[in-house]
Design a protein with these regions (language model features):
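Glycine-rich flexible loops
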Residues: 1-240
Length: 240
């Protein structure tokens, strides 16, 4: 099977987000990239779940391969996810991203629908996201009517650039009135970040219910928890 390693990883992440409870019916997708693949054109290829296929019936061979240069299918019998242009634009805009996950998970989607940012209220959030996970602006009628999925990606990138957010430090976003996207250095890390995003969104909602005036944690505590795992002198976990 061509692109076997990429297809297997993307398949496992798609199955993983279902097992993690982030997906209802077919409301979600995961993708990964191989930026070294020469036959996909400049920039390599991405693999993504086919559109509308039930997860119980999904196999690695079903994963559709798309050129990062053109956004066109280069291998695979099915149609790629309808969200493919969003994933494609994120890969093109954020070179450090190796995997993207989109779901309609309950709590993160609730914040997206409320058009609320997800500020860092505690250390669980700080261990994974270096500050507020932003919500995008609402899309215009023209953006929705023309190339909607591609414009979704463009609005995400616009949000990060205008707010000067490092996509490697905040590997997630809430698309207004839509839902969450998460990413990582590879597709399994993107899946992990999607799981964490849903968990901290649930914690946030319950924190607001207990204390409506709760504030973001102090910068010193945010720095301590994020940098001990991700900083130049990180010491969390075992040495590789």
């Amino acid at each position: 099977m061509k692109y076997e390693k990429l297809r297997q990883a993307v398949y496992e992440a798609n199955v993983g987000i279902v097992k993690a409870g982030l997906v209802v019916l077919t409301w979600g997708n995961a993708s990964g990239v191989d930026r070294t693949a020469e036959d996909g054109g400049e920039g390599g290829v991405m693999g993504i779940k086919p559109s509308g296929v039930e997860y119980e019936k999904l196999t690695p061979a079903d994963i559709v391969i798309v050129s990062l240069a053109t956004g066109k299918v280069v291998d695979g019998a099915g149609r790629p996810s309808s969200d493919t242009p969003t994933h494609w634009h994120l890969y093109r805009s954020f070179p450090s991203v190796g995997g993207v996950v989109h779901t309609h998970s309950l709590y993160a989607t609730s914040f997206a629908q409320a058009q609320r940012d997800l500020p860092c209220l505690g250390t669980t959030h700080a261990d994974h996201f270096y500050g507020t996970v932003p919500v995008t602006r609402a899309m215009t009628a023209e953006e929705i009517a023309t190339e909607y999925e591609l414009n979704t990606g463009k609005v995400i990138v616009e949000t990060f650039r205008e707010k000067k957010i490092d996509a490697a430090q905040i590997p997630a976003v809430l698309v207004a009135s839509h839902g969450p996207f998460a990413w990582g250095t590879d597709v399994m890390k993107a899946m992990e970040n999607a799981i964490v995003l849903e968990s901290v969104a649930r914690m946030q909602l319950q924190s607001y219910q207990l204390n409506a005036g709760v504030k973001a944690i102090p910068a010193a505590l945010l720095d301590k928890h994020y940098l001990r795992k991700h900083g130049a002198n990180a010491y969390y976990g075992q040495k590789k």
